[in-house]
Design a protein with these regions (language model features):
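Flexible, compositionally biased loop and terminal segments
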Residues: 1-228
């Protein structure tokens, strides 16, 4: 990078293309998700090595429950595996937060979420990895408004933000979507109003360290006016 002082404070990833990657190589969808898991862990390592304070990964949306029961069940098993691997690979390097509608998941997975957050909370000053599971931007905003009304607080931008599932996470400076699609797909609609968007054709399992580095370099060259 030309300017290390312009590292983003928060990067968001829409990890798209696992199934199409698998199909392009003649494999079932689940194979693509497993390959995507390896890329996810590698990118987490790169984020931490670069000392980017926050990164959020869109892993499973509220709409993804509509997929076939077999694929959903395979993904739930993969989530448990990923969380176990993350616990070891990121040990004492960062905090891990799971954001989304926890109530959609089985109790054993919810317990995994609670344990992982509790065990890593002390390392938030070293970085925080946010994983969006059963996440949808509209669902998040609906839940935030319900919580805000119940609290009796005055409605403001600040109070709404404080009731979001992502409360405490800075708005992403960068959103990276792999897989060629050019939309946000219900990802962080409140938080991305000033995000720099990077849409890349590479399927998520094929996304590389060099590609991420090039995006960081391009971001460093951009002048962000934020409405000014």
């Amino acid at each position: 990078m030309n300017n290390m002082n312009k590292l983003p404070n928060c990067v968001g990833f829409i990890m798209d293309g696992n199934r199409r990657y698998a199909e392009s190589l003649g494999h079932e969808a689940v194979w693509g998700h497993v390959a995507g898991k390896d890329t996810f862990l590698a990118v987490v390592d790169q984020v931490l090595e670069a000392k980017i304070p926050h990164a959020i990964f869109y892993a499973f949306s509220t709409e993804n429950w509509k997929r076939s029961p077999g694929e959903v069940e395979a993904l739930l098993g993969l989530f448990k595996q990923v969380l176990t691997e993350m616990k070891e690979s990121t040990k004492e390097k960062c905090a891990i937060r799971i954001v989304g509608r926890w109530s959609d998941f089985r109790e054993d997975l919810q317990e995994n979420f609670r344990e992982l957050e509790a065990e890593t909370a002390a390392y938030a000053s070293r970085g925080t990895i946010w994983i969006a599971l059963s996440y949808g931007g509209r669902a998040e905003l609906t839940a935030a408004v319900e919580s805000l009304v119940a609290s009796g607080e005055v409605v403001s931008e600040e109070s709404i933000a404080a009731h979001l599932w992502t409360a405490g996470m800075p708005d992403p400076d960068i959103i990276i979507r792999t897989g060629g699609e050019q939309r946000l797909s219900n990802f962080l609609p409140w938080q991305t109003v000033y995000s720099e968007l990077f849409f890349v054709p590479t399927y998520w399992p094929a996304f590389t360290k060099d590609e991420f580095t090039r995006i960081l370099s391009a971001y460093a060259e951009r002048e962000r006016r934020i409405g000014k």
